[in-house]
Structures are given as C-alpha cells and as structure tokens.
Amino acid sequence: MAITLLEGALYGFFAVTGVLIASFIIGEIVHLYNEKQSNENFAKAIDQMSKSTVTAIESIKDTTVTGINALLNMDTLRDVNSLAREKAKDQNPSSQAK
C-alpha cells in the first residue's frame, strides 16, 4: 500500500497539530507552575511583612512604656526632692534665718 500525497499531507498535518497541542500543554503546565511559585513567594513576602509589622508595633509599645515609666520616675523624683527639701527645712530652721 502506497501512501498517497493526500494521505502524507494529512499525516503531516496531524503530526504538526499534535506537536502544537503538546507544546501548548507543556507551556500551560510551565505557566501554572511559575504562577504557583509566584503566589508562594508572594505569600512568604506577606508573612514576612506581617512579622516585621508585629515586631515594629511591639518595639513602639516597649518604647512608649519606657517613656511613660521615665516620665513617672521623673515625677516621683520631683516629689522625693520636694519632701527632702521640706524635711531639711523642718530640721534646720536656723538655715532659713540666715
């Protein structure tokens, strides 16, 4: 059986169509894999940013608490100094007369 020219052209057409379909499928698989990798990397980046934000907020909170404690300590120190001056005045009335 000899293959006629028309049959040869038809087989060639099917072969080229099969190659094109196979390349399209492989291209889609590669595209979907790259998209999956991109989404995973994006999710990792968002997770890292969330962790950094939490760390920054905790740092701001700690700094604020430290500042408030420092202000309270200054106020307490002022009270202690006032009490010490009053006590010194009470114990040493002759120094006021000078």
Swiss-Prot record:
Domain of life the protein comes from: Viruses
Consequence recorded when altering residue 46 to V: In strain: Isolate variant XX
Protein name: Uncharacterized protein 98
Record's subcellular location: Host membrane
Annotated GO CC locations: host cell membrane; membrane
Transmembrane segments: 10-30
Alphabetical UniProt keywords: Host membrane, Membrane, Transmembrane, Transmembrane helix
Classification of source organism: Viruses, Adnaviria, Zilligvirae, Taleaviricota, Tokiviricetes
Membrane topology annotation: Single-pass membrane protein
